[in-house]
Amino acid sequence: MNIVYWFTFEDRVKNKTPPYYYIGSKLNCSFENGIIYDSSGKEYWSSCKQKRFLNALMLQKPSVKIIQIDDDLDVIEAERKYQLEVNARDNPDYFNLVYAGGGFGVSGETHPAKDPEVREHMRLANYMNRDDFRPWKTSRANIESWKLSHIAYENYVLLLSSNLYGKTPGWRRVKGNINITDTTAKSMVKYFNSGWIPLEDPEYCELCQL
């Protein structure tokens, strides 16, 4: 299932030491006994790498409230909606440093992303950088093309191994005669370059029912 969740650090609320809350989202997960589990069955406490959030997490696991759940949910959009409702980015009661999908509305030397910690949080807020992101789950994705990723990957590996200079194979050569769209082929090569191996990804195997 896909969810939008709300963390509350109860001890921080009790001791009046803000921030107290964090709003996030998770794809392909389960929720049991107050804990979110990712697709591999591991406990999930957000992808936030903010130092003060991690310190708070070490002291106490927050209580978890699921505020929206839907298998077809566009979690990034829903997450952003809830964050905007409470002005989470600028609200001292919340750990959120950016809105889901990124974006501050300011520029230049005063831009918050000048801070390395904020910049990292901003990077993680971009859904494409999340561990649970899969390219075929976007609204514009051609799912049938993505189901042929393992075949395209075979071409990719073959071309890479035969390249004496170790250059990345072009998307046209990777596509070859495979019935996939040009846009998908370009995206596939990008993900292959990042180390993605289709048949080693449980979510891809589930997609293709392999």
Swiss-Prot record:
Top-level taxon in the UniProt lineage: Viruses
Name used for this protein in its record: Uncharacterized 24.6 kDa protein in Gp32-Gp59 intergenic region
Annotated organism of origin: Enterobacteria phage T4 (Bacteriophage T4)
